[in-house]
Amino acid sequence: MKRTYQPNRRKRAKTHGFRKRMSSVGGRRIIAARRRRGRKRLAV
């Protein structure tokens, strides 16, 4: 059986990347929350 996680850098960035997050209101909220927490990495 094929495993569910098949790493792919491009797919990862396109799905969870910074620009993708900024493209929606919900995503902007996530970035803001991570900024508030002081996360080193905001998105992938």
Swiss-Prot record:
One Gene Ontology biological process: translation
A GO CC term assigned to this protein in UniProt: ribonucleoprotein complex
MF terms (GO), sorted A to Z: structural constituent of ribosome
InterPro entries on file: Ribosomal_bL34, Ribosomal_bL34_CS
Keyword Ribosomal protein part of the UniProt annotation: yes
Pfam families per record: Ribosomal_L34 (PF00468)
Source taxon at top rank: Bacteria
Biased composition, class Basic residues, residue ranges: 1-22
Entry keywords, A to Z: Ribonucleoprotein, Ribosomal protein
Chain residue ranges for the region called Disordered: 1-24
Family statement drawn from the similarity comment of this UniProt entry: Belongs to the bacterial ribosomal protein bL34 family.
Name of this chain's protein: Large ribosomal subunit protein bL34
Organism: Rubrobacter xylanophilus (strain DSM 9941 / JCM 11954 / NBRC 16129 / PRD-1)
Lineage: Bacteria, Bacillati, Actinomycetota, Rubrobacteria, Rubrobacterales
Gene encoding the protein: rpmH
